[in-house]
């Protein structure tokens, strides 16, 4: 069977960026940037992206493009006879399932809140406490949460059932272009608010006071972690798109473009959030509390609040759903390649499977609220711990070692693949850095997540 491929370079870039752009761009990046000295953090974050994120991203893409296969078979195609690197491909599949077990639930929250603003369930007559308490009410309702999570699952697999070009690429291109327009409209509106200057000063103006208060170590570790995790590396979510791309352009250039889009959205998210928070005297937070408890009352209290709230959550739906589609495609590709089944059959099997696997996260906030499977964490945080603290860093280390060590694919073959085509090329002089320094940095991130 002929390998599917992207219709255009723009399709590849937007789908890959859509995989990277997710909820963390909005509920984590702006907060830690403001906390860690604003502009200083952004500069250090960009440096970490270049020295860590871009190299590992090129490795996932290179394995995919050289093999023209998904996770398991890509290793089998490139590894030497008798080697077992392909075992990691199964852990990539496990990581994708685990990620979707909670990401579909959180994406469902976005859909629910979009509906609340659109239908007027949130309106200007409500008190701040009433709006903020709606989040707890939603979490305590397994029926409401399950409904929206399953809507996300069905919609995601429906799109993917149409194939790469007619499904994933076509829908993601429209979503990502709408996302970029929405984020610009929301950012421009936030900059017209009375607290815009104060909010942007906290967010981006370099501040040594913040660094002294939180410590330089906090800046370094937060920048490293954010640069690493924002790209969702280590579970083959990017590798699959390498297998669909052409040989016309070098991988370092494409990786830089993907990172630039991801960073643009993260920076613009802060431009939306901080002026609004400072205008209405609300302390910026991070995580779900920011999106579902801090910001909705802010929108309700501003002129045209229902409209701006609905636009914001539509933007959040696009950000989260682009990741859902990308990971669903990876799951389907692994199943189709490895087991030789049709796309339609893979969609049916995995749709039912992920619909069922999403329920523990839903129930973890209500009927299973006492269930704390890992280190006293609830179900969602336990699933996220396994993905973010174990599978992503360990998986990235495996891809790195496979690409640069002679007992893997080998640095020379990796270098030839990444430099194929026109664009930015990697120098062979980077070999010592890739073989010795970069693995140590990834191990540091792994240990930070476990300690």
Enumerate the language-model features and the residues they cover.
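C-terminal membrane-solvent junction of multi-pass transporters and transport-like membrane proteins
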Residues: 88, 339-351, 382-442
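Loop-to-transmembrane helix boundary motifs in multi-pass membrane proteins
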Residues: 5, 11-13, 19, 146-147, ...
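Membrane-water interface regions at transmembrane-helix termini and the short interhelical loops
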Residues: 32-36, 84-100, 136-140, 151-175, ...
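Membrane-interface "cap" regions at the ends of multi-pass membrane proteins
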Residues: 1-27, 56-61, 65-87, 246-250, ...
């Amino acid at each position: 069977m002929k390998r599917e491929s992207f219709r255009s370079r723009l399709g590849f870039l937007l789908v890959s960026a859509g995989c990277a752009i997710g909820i963390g761009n909005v509920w984590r990046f702006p907060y830690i940037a403001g906390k860690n000295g604003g502009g200083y953090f952004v500069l250090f974050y960009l440096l970490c992206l270049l020295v860590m994120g871009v190299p590992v991203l090129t490795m996932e893409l290179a394995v995919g493009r050289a093999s023209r296969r998904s996770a398991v078979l890509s290793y089998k195609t490139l590894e030497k006879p008798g080697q077992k690197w392909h075992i990691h491909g199964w852990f990539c599949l496990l990581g994708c399932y685990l990620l979707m077990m909670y990401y579909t639930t959180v994406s469902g929250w976005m859909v629910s809140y979009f509906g609340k603003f659109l239908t007027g369930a949130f309106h200007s007559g409500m008190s701040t406490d009433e709006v903020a308490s709606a989040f707890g009410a939603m979490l305590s309702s397994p029926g409401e949460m399950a409904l929206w999570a399953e809507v996300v699952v069905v919609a995601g697999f429906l799109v993917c059932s149409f194939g790469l070009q007619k499904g994933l690429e076509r829908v993601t291109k429209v979503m990502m272009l709408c996302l970029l327009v929405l984020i610009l409209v929301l950012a421009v509106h936030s900059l017209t608010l009375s607290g815009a200057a104060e909010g942007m000063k906290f967010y981006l103006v370099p501040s040594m006071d913040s660094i002294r208060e939180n410590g330089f170590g906090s800046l370094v570790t937060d920048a490293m972690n954010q640069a690493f995790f924002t790209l969702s590396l280590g579970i083959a979510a990017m590798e699959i798109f390498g297998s669909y791309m052409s040989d016309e352009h070098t991988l370092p250039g494409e990786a830089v473009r993907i990172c630039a889009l991801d960073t643009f959205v993260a920076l613009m998210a802060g431009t939306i959030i901080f002026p609004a928070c400072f205008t209405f005297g609300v302390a910026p937070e991070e995580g779900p509390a920011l999106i579902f408890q801090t910001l909705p009352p802010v929108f309700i209290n501003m002129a045209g609040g229902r409209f701006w709230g609905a636009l914001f959550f539509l933007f959040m739906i696009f950000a989260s759903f682009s990741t859902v589609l990308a990971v669903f495609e990876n799951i389907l590709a692994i199943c189709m390649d490895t087991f030789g089944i049709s796309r339609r059959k893979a969609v049916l099997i995995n749709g039912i499977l992920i619909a069922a696997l999403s329920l523990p996260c839903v129930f973890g906030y209500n009927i299973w609220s006492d269930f704390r499977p890992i280190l006293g964490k609830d179900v969602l945080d336990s699933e996220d711990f396994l993905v973010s603290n174990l599978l992503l860093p360990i998986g990235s280390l495996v891809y790195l070692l496979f690409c640069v060590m002679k007992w893997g694919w080998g640095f020379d073959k990796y270098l030839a693949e990444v430099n194929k085509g026109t664009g930015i090329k990697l120098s062979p002089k980077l070999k010592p850095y890739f073989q010795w320094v970069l693995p140590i940095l990834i191990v540091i991130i792994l240990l930070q997540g476990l300690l």
